[in-house]
Curated annotation (Swiss-Prot):
Matches recorded under InterPro entries: Formyl_transferase-like_C_sf (IPR011034), MPG (IPR003180), MPG_sf (IPR036995)
Keywords noted in UniProt: DNA damage, DNA repair, Hydrolase
GO terms (BP aspect): base-excision repair
SUPFAM superfamilies, sorted: FMT C-terminal domain-like
Listed EC numbers: 3.2.2.-
Family membership noted in the UniProt record: Belongs to the DNA glycosylase MPG family.
Protein name as annotated: Putative 3-methyladenine DNA glycosylase
Lineage: Bacteria, Pseudomonadati, Spirochaetota, Spirochaetia, Spirochaetales
Xref: CDD domains: AAG
A molecular function GO annotation: alkylbase DNA N-glycosylase activity
Stretch forming the signal peptide: none
Originating organism: Borrelia garinii subsp. bavariensis (strain ATCC BAA-2496 / DSM 23469 / PBi) (Borreliella bavariensis)
């Protein structure tokens, strides 16, 4: 995937990432997983987004990078969330990767290990050291196109954003592969 792919808005990239591969190398071993669920966060106008209203802090600074960088943060003092920054620099949009399907044969196929954003980061050993990493050309964590993209996409409301304004709560900016058993919630 090239930089241009990530310069599109978060809702577009969130859909296009489905079915593609997230690859993590640990100790020279490659863990390959298919992205099966995403959520789009559309920046300063989206009250569910960390950059809502132009908010810029040490935590959210990665969102202001050019598309193709990672945005990793911790919630509840224990779970890391992995996001892909989209759009132009200083247009802070991101896609939360909510669930993945392990592809590497040695990993097994236990959905309970990767069917949520905190679970997948634990599974892939993603922590704050991966915040603000350029995912293009990185050799430890990167995205790759997959040619097997024959599936239906379900659009639904995002999860756990009760703090947002009602119109943002009701936007169908969560996307997942229909009938995939690794999706966190249906």
């Amino acid at each position: 995937m090239d930089r241009y792919f990530f310069l599109q808005d978060a809702t577009t990239v969130a859909r296009l990432l489905l079915g593609n591969l997230l690859i993590r190398k640990i100790n020279k071993k490659e863990i390959v997983a298919r992205i099966v669920e995403t959520e789009a966060y559309m920046g300063i106008a989206d009250s569910a987004c960390h950059s809502y209203g132009g908010k810029r802090t040490n935590r959210t600074n990665a969102m202001y990078s050019i598309g193709g960088y990672s945005y990793v943060y911790m919630i509840y003092g224990m779970h890391y969330m992995f996001n892909v920054v989209t759009a132009d620099k200083n247009n802070p949009q991101a896609v939360l990767i909510r669930s993945i399907e392990p592809i590497s044969p040695l990993l097994g196929k236990k959905s309970a290990l990767t069917n949520g954003p905190g679970k997948l980061t634990k599974f892939l050993n993603i922590d704050l050291t991966f915040n603000k990493v350029d995912l293009i050309g990185n050799n430890e964590l990167f995205l790759q196109r997959d040619l097997n993209l024959d599936f239906n996409i379900v659009c639904s409301k995002r999860i756990n954003i009760n703090y947002a304004q009602e119109d943002d709560i009701n936007k169908l900016w969560r996307f997942y592969i229909k009938d995939n058993k690794f999706v966190s919630r249906r």
